[in-house]
Amino acid sequence: MDYTPEFQLREATESDRTYLRRLNYLADVFGNEEGDVGHSEREGAEAYVGQWDPERESGIVAFDQFHVPAGGVWLRYWQSPDDGYANLAPNIPEIAIAVENRYAGNRLAVRLLQAAVELAKRQGAPKVALWVDPDNDRARHRYEKFGFANVEGEDDVMVVDVEDFTA
């Protein structure tokens, strides 16, 4: 039976931490659930999800019409310059995003990205940043369409002013 999923979005809470771990895994293996996660990715999971503060940083989780988790995005405001992969400043959140493979092609990632930028704007952030593999031309092209630009000297970091984001 074919169906077009309908998504509901809500702010992430502490109870979503386990699901965010799954999404972090999907992001680390670029959606390939048979992919191996290296040592640095395992350590990164603690920083990106284990130390995530839902009250201060928040995020968005998406569900389909049957209340099945479909994807999510979460913000990390890094305090130390050595933390994170796309850490530009303490007031610029790095966003992490992933969508379950079965929901690919339904523009859910666009809705999540838009919701994350709106959330960051409400929190007073001037910009949002993200890490994207320099060889992932498809993703980089998509982010550029939304207004993201490469950060000079950081070939794997992109940033957009929250006022310039276009979905």
Identify the role of each PLM range.
Residues 79-88:
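A short, polar/charged loop-to-alpha-helix boundary motif
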Residues 36-65:
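Active-site rim helix/loop that mediates acceptor-substrate recognition in acyltransferases
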Residues 1-18, 164-167:
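Conserved N-terminal entry element of GNAT/NAT acetyltransferase domains
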